[in-house]
Structure formats: C-alpha cells, structure tokens
C-alpha cells in the first residue's frame, strides 16, 4: 500500500510517500526556521499562514520525488495532534480534501506515536517491546512500547520539555532560535563540570521530568555573571547540556530496568544531539542494553514517520471521517 504522509503540527511543512509500512519513497520538509528566528520562537499565526503557502508545493514535490502519480496513492496519513491548532488544521484539511477527492481512506496520526514509528524506519529497528524516550521541543516522555499499537506512558515532563529548555537557554545566551544545535555546538567548546547546575530527578522511583529548576539556575547564573559572560558561555552551555543529559539518561535506564526491557530507544528532535547519543551508548553498554536511534533525517518532525504510523492505522481500518478534527493537547487516539 502506498501512503501519502502529511505533517504540519508546528513550524515544518512536510510530506512523504511510504510503501509497505517502512519503505520511504520520498520525504520533503519545508522549514520555517529562518522566518521564526527573528522573533526568537514560533509565532503560531505566522506558522499557519506559511503552512498554507507551502502545503501544495511540498506534497507535489514528495509525489514527484517518489516517482509515482497522485492516482497511485492508496491512502493518506496526517498529523492530528498534539500541536498548534492553526498549523494542524492546514495539513489536516488538505489531507481530508485529497482523500475525499481521490475516494481513498485517510487516518489521523498522533504526533508522538509518529515519532516512535520513526525508529521503525531504521535499517535495524528495535524489536518489541522496548522502552523509548521521546524528547523534542514540545514533549519529553518515556513510553513502554509493547507492540505496534500499544504505547504505555511511563512518565512525562511536568513543565518544560527538554528541547524547549535548550531553546530558552539559547535565548538567555543570545544565541537565537532554534537553540538545540547552537547550544550543542557551543557546549563542545566548554567544560561540562565547571558549573554544577542542579539535576532534578524528582521522585527517583518515578519517571517524570522537570527542567524548570535547571532553566532558572541557568538564568540566575547568567544574571550574576554578566561581566564575564562571553568567556563563560561555552561552559554554561556545556554544564546545562550535561545536566539535561544526566536526567534523561537516568530516567530512561531506570524505566527500562523497571519494565524489564533490554532495548532502549530515543526519538524526537533531541535524539539528534550527539552528546546525548554518546552518553546513552555508554549507559546502554554499562547496563547490557541495546540502544536504537532514528535515522538522522527522521529525528525532527517529518512526514515519513506519520505515513508509517498511518499505514498501520489504515490497514486496521482505524480511519478518520469528514467530521473528524484535530487536537492540541497530548492524548492517544
């Protein structure tokens, strides 16, 4: 079955064509980063307007790169939530109209489940069950992934997501938006042990996260060290990144041991962080666990993961109807 995937939950307009569950024929992403950079973050209304401009060309490009005609598409999968309502509605409305015009089935995909499915697009996907950390700009959660359709939420952030914390620290340091890659690059020049930022493990027997305290500690340090901030910036970035990584690694390993899993995985935009990946490889080896990461091109938001998850939903008959709608908050479909 050939599935067209569409993703528009935040500031990336993406389309992909996937066949046979995990064979990616094409994947196109149109980023709005250059536009939102000047505002220091995503402007929802602006994001929606840019999705409207990009959606048709992006879908056309994905179909063309897949080497197929639109008539060969047998189903449509589209992100239904969570995300920015206006942004979601652009992709969702396009998918609904496309499927209705072609008289083909369509499915709404939970964005978080899509990120978990990005792990299945690898040449060496994890076998079930596995324990997955999903870390991005909007979400930080741990799931026990029992099967293709069973995702048990073990813990989640109580405040800021890990990626969101990176963005906010980048803003404190005057590095602009988005912050993940620039903080990582700056941290590579610093000493992660020089500034002992706090690690918030909350209840060590639980799997929830909290990064607001760490964010506040960085803000206080920046405020108190304005005079030599320039020379300290690499060390601030390194200390912050190390603190986030320590918490993510501890919680993921702890959750895997609690569920009896020997396979762990990281998905979402933060999985592209090489410092985190390197640390998790060490921790996995230390605990005799296998670590899985998505292909680099599928770490961030993309439509291939949406198409892969949608393929499964359509195969099971779990379809959307004309009165189906999007949702902004995290939930499972």
UniProtKB/Swiss-Prot annotation:
One of its GO terms (cellular component) is cytoplasm. Its cofactor is Fe(2+). It comes from the Bacteria. This is tRNA N6-adenosine threonylcarbamoyltransferase. The keyword Isomerase does not apply. Its main location: cytoplasm. GO terms for molecular function: iron ion binding; N(6)-L-threonylcarbamoyladenine synthase activity. Fe cation binds at residues 111, 115, 301. Required for the formation of a threonylcarbamoyl group on adenosine at position 37 (t(6)A37) in tRNAs that read codons beginning with adenine. Is involved in the transfer of the threonylcarbamoyl moiety of threonylcarbamoyl-AMP (TC-AMP) to the N6 group of A37, together with TsaE and TsaB. TsaD likely plays a direct catalytic role in this reaction. GO terms for biological process: tRNA threonylcarbamoyladenosine modification. It catalyses: L-threonylcarbamoyladenylate + adenosine(37) in tRNA = N(6)-L-threonylcarbamoyladenosine(37) in tRNA + AMP + H(+). InterPro entries: ATPase_NBD, Gcp-like_dom, KAE1/TsaD, TsaD. Belongs to the KAE1 / TsaD family. Binds 1 Fe(2+) ion per subunit. SUPFAM superfamilies: Actin-like ATPase domain. It holds the Pfam family TsaD. It is found in: Cytoplasm. Keywords: Acyltransferase, Cytoplasm, Iron, Metal-binding, Transferase, tRNA processing. Its EC number is 2.3.1.234. The keyword Iron applies. Substrate binds at residues 134-138, 167, 180, 273. It is an enzyme of class 2 (transferase).
């Amino acid at each position: 079955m050939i599935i067209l995937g569409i993703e528009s939950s935040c500031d990336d307009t993406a389309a992909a064509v996937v066949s046979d569950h995990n064979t990616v024929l094409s994947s196109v992403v149109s980023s709005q980063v250059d536009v939102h950079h000047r505002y220091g973050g995503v402007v929802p209304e602006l994001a929606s307007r840019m999705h409207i401009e990009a959606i048709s060309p992006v879908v056309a490009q994905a179909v063309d790169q897949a080497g197929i005609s639109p008539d060969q598409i047998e189903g449509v999968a589209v992100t239904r939530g969570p995300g920015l309502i206006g942004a979601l509605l652009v992709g969702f409305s396009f998918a609904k109209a496309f499927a209705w015009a072609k008289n083909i089935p369509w499915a709404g995909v939970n964005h978080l489940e899509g990120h978990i499915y990005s792990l299945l697009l690898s040449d060496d996907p994890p076998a079930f069950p596995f324990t997955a950390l999903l870390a991005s700009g909007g979400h930080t959660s741990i799931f026990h992934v029992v099967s293709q359709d069973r995702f048990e939420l073990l813990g989640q952030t109580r405040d800021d997501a890990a990626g969101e914390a990176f963005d906010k620290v980048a803003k404190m340091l005057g590095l602009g938006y988005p912050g993940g890659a620039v903080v990582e690059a700056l941290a590579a020049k610093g000493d992660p042990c020089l500034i002992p930022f706090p690690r918030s493990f909350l209840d060590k027997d639980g799997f929830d996260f909290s990064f607001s305290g760490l964010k506040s500690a960085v803000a206080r340090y920046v405020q108190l060290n304005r005079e030599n901030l320039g020379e300290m910036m690499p060390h601030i970035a390194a200390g912050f990144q190390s603190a986030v990584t320590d918490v993510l690694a501890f919680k993921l390993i702890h959750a895997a041991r609690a569920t009896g899993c020997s396979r762990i995985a990281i998905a979402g935009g933060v999985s592209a962080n090489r410092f985190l990946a390197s640390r998790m490889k060490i921790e996995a080896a230390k605990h005799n666990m296998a670590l899985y990461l998505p292909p680099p091109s599928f770490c961030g938001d993309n439509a291939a993961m949406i198409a892969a998850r949608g393929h499964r939903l359509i195969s099971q008959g779990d379809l959307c109807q004309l009165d189906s709608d999007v949702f902004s908050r995290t939930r499972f479909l």
